């Protein structure tokens, strides 16, 4: 039997914990690396810390089948690139965190 490996919205119990006690699963780390320039001079932790929560996180949803995030944290690296950290409540007591970064989405610039 073969197993298809995917990181799509996987919330495993192997979380890094950000300074504000938000869990960061491997999926979100992978998406940050995938969706930001490879030669970026700002890493994930710095982008998260320098980012700002938006007042109405419900505007940052992915599609109709996924619920809106409880929090959305935006980091813009000038006009070059930017990301949105989509943060949801984590109801799993074994993780030890109240919130988790569900995924990281690139900001498209037009």
Pin down the residues of each PLM region:
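Ribonuclease/tRNase effector modules and their secretory precursors
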Residues: 1-110
């Amino acid at each position: 039997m073969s197993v298809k490996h995917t990181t799509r919205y996987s919330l495993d119990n192997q979380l890094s914990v950000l300074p504000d006690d938000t869990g960061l699963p491997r999926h979100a780390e992978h998406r940050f690396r995938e969706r930001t320039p490879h030669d970026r001079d700002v890493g994930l932790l710095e982008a998260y810390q320098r980012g700002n929560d938006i007042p109405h996180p419900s505007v940052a949803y992915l599609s109709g089948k996924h619920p809106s995030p409880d929090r959305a944290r935006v980091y813009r690296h000038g006009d070059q690139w930017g990301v949105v950290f989509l943060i949801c409540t984590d109801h799993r007591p074994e993780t030890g965190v109240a919130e988790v970064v569900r995924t990281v989405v690139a900001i498209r610039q037009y």
